[in-house]
Amino acid sequence: MTMTFMSSPSLLMTSESVTEGHPDKVCDQIADAILDEIIGHDPDAHVACEVTATTGLVVIMGEISTAHHVDYTGIARQVIRDVGYTKSEHGFSFESCGVVVSVKEQSREIAAAVGADEGAGDQGIMLGFACN
């Protein structure tokens, strides 16, 4: 009998859970707010938005095709303020952090591959394991 990933006797499944205010959560909230803003004005938009952050800096990037003008910096600062990062002496503040935006239109290839029945053409969750 061959052993599979799921039948391995030494299988250890782990996951990470972060709490409110963690940079991963803040970045997710910024991306969600950007999507909400766009879809609220342009339901036919195509959005692939990624957000990352470090001390004093937020970077918004991706491929977004929409007819709606988006104030990416304003949305990011509002989310950061709403989360509670309001004092620069704490290492991060909505007023003093840098916000870099690098967004371009979605590529024609991805846009052509995504139809009304399929909302995402290049998204997935990967699960793997190491072996010798």
Model-derived features with residue positions:
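A domain-level signal for the structural core that forms small-molecule/cofactor-binding pockets
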Residues: T2-N132
